[in-house]
């Protein structure tokens, strides 16, 4: 008999990390300004979210958390706050077009990284390579077929 095909996952989370160069840390106000200029809104769970509507209304497409546990941001502390990095995450299945949401999250992570002088890393905190991006795209496609 033929082996049973692997069941497709019911859910997944695509993670892209943005980390400071070496031991550099991202400072609060500079980080928060970059996230906000790139369409993210501070909200639920004290983290940033990209909504379907740029005004901050509508469904959440993806979110950004502090890389350091417990993951939230201390926005009121502004300049006193710093972190070695941030984590962008796209839960699957998601609202809307998963491929579009992934592309938007990747572009946003690259923009924030460029503005802050950081590195874009994968979920294991290794450099994000074109092969890894392709792997992420394949994982996203599984949910586009459902």
Q: How would you name each of these model-derived features?
A:
Residues 20-22, 68, 92-94:
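Beta-strand elements of well-folded, non-transmembrane domains
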Residues 13-19, 88:
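Active-site-flanking beta-strand signature of metal-NTP-handling nucleotidyl enzymes
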Residues 23-41:
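Amphipathic alpha-helical segments
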Residues 42-78:
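Positively charged, polar, low-complexity stretches
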Residues 27, 31, 44, 56, ...:
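Helical mechanochemical/support elements of P-loop NTPase systems and associated helical scaffolds
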Residues 87-146:
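Well-ordered alpha/beta subsegment
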Residues 1-10:
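Extended, low-complexity intrinsically disordered regions enriched in serine/proline/glycine/threonine
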């Amino acid at each position: 008999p033929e082996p049973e095909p692997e069941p497709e996952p019911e859910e997944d989370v695509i993670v892209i990390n943005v980390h400071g160069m070496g031991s550099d840390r991202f400072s609060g106000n500079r980080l928060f300004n970059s996230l906000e200029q790139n369409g993210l809104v501070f909200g639920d769970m004290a983290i940033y979210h990209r909504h379907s509507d740029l005004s901050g209304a509508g469904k959440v497409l993806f979110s950004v958390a502090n890389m350091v546990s417990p993951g939230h941001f201390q926005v009121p502390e502004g300049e006193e706050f710093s972190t070695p990095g941030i984590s962008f995450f796209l839960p699957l299945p998601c609202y809307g077009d998963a491929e579009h949401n992934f592309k938007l999250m990747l572009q946003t992570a690259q923009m924030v990284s460029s503005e802050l002088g950081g590195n874009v890393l994968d979920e294991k905190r290794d450099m994000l390579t074109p092969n890894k991006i392709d792997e992420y795209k394949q994982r996203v496609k599984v949910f586009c077929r459902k």
